[in-house]
Amino acid sequence: MKKLVSALLVSSMAISLVGCGAPKAPAAAEATTAAATQAAAEATTAAPAGPEAITLKVWAPQVDQVDENSWINVMLPKFEEAHPEYEITWDIGVCGEGDAASIVKNDPAAAADVFFYANDQMGTLIEAGALSKLGGSYLETVQNNFSQTHVDLLTYTDGGVYGFPTSPNTWFMWYNKETFNEEDIKNIGTMLEKGVVSFPMDNSWYTGTFFFGVGATVFGPQGVDAEAGIDFSSDLCVEATKYMIEMVKSPNFVNDVDGIGVAGMKDGSIQAMFSGDWDQPALAESLGDKLGCAVLPKFTMNGTDYQMKSFASNKAVGVNPNAKFPKAAMQLAQFLTSPEALLSRYELSGYTPAASACAEEEAIKSNPTVATLNAQMANTIAQPVLAEMANFWDPVKNFGLNILNGSITADNAKEMLDATMQLLNSNGL
């Protein structure tokens, strides 16, 4: 049979598919004494009670529930098959990963039991009492099925892991294969000698790549130590600043702003740029087989190569600690982020799967963009989720702007970097 429930606070649709299967002792029996239980068992030969009736409220992105063949509507019946101990009423609502915190925190008790969220919202959700910390077999599953980077991205200041990863998010390099060969793309200096390279020097999500490449940290090695602050103070960071100064002076350098990179790649005036998988459709349409993608290149300072590194973030499935049926909610979150489920989501919704095992699947290996995104995750630092991260974006953006306009020079590089450090840690860190 099917059960329907009322609409959610968010735009929603309600569906229900009831599972059935192996019988389970009723919860009421647990309240009786051992003697009464034994007497009742001896007094009757009636069939044992059926599955436990539960309701699970799930909020997922619109793309995952467009129609009955969409991912979430395919996976929920499979969860029922895997858990015949439950008779489940499904309450399904639409809520994108980027909107989860703003909606859930308003009334955590009324929010979904299981929801999808972007990891930069983790702190807000935890502080609102709306996100469960994983433990036991659930924590072990995350640690075993996902890379350490994905685990770190969902680790909070208390050391707890607060979600099941679904998909990665970072940036890498796009290039024109007619200009650069596989050897060229290993070093950005070599590329600047052969073709026009576009890089968003004044976009702080990208600018830090050279600092990260020489060991700079943002709130410690794992990005969760507020007291450690943002540390761009090393001599190598000064040298990296000088490298950036020389880089923007190259006649083959173009600052990527307002879509210049994509436009230039499409018309042929630019041969390499840096962004993520979101630009793949536009670039592939124009370049076809000429389009290549690769992990970030290295850069050379004083004869030593350093690896450019990007910020990494991810998206996850979280469980609300206010869930009426917390065990079932945890089981569902775990089920939806299994390698098999995430591969299905890739096929039906287009999300790159975060599970390590998925990288070995032919569907993933045969997609250069997805393979590159997964490979780049190994050359990243975790984008911190601390509130203090708000101090990062504007000072680093302005640092990049001052490199572009010539205000920062080789002579004042250390002085300007020190001044930026003060702004980055201006709240007393």
PLM features: what roles do these ranges have?
Residues S6-A7, L17-G123, T300-G303, A419-L429:
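Conserved N-terminal structural module of periplasmic/extracytoplasmic solute-binding proteins
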Residues A41-A43, A47-P48, N119-F172, E183, ...:
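Hinge/lid segment of periplasmic solute-binding proteins
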Residues P61, M75-L76, F115, M247-F325:
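Extracytoplasmic/periplasmic substrate-binding proteins
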Residues A101-K105, A110-D113, E140-Y175, V196-P200, ...:
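A structural signal for short loop-to-beta-strand junctions that line the ligand-binding cleft
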Residues Y162-T166, W171, I188-I230, L236, ...:
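Extracytoplasmic/periplasmic solute-binding protein
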Residues A226-N255:
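Glycine-centered hinge/linker elements that transmit conformational signals in sensory
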Residues P281, K315-A390:
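Mature extracytoplasmic/periplasmic domains
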Residues A375-L429:
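Conserved C-terminal helix/tail region of periplasmic/extracytoplasmic solute-binding proteins
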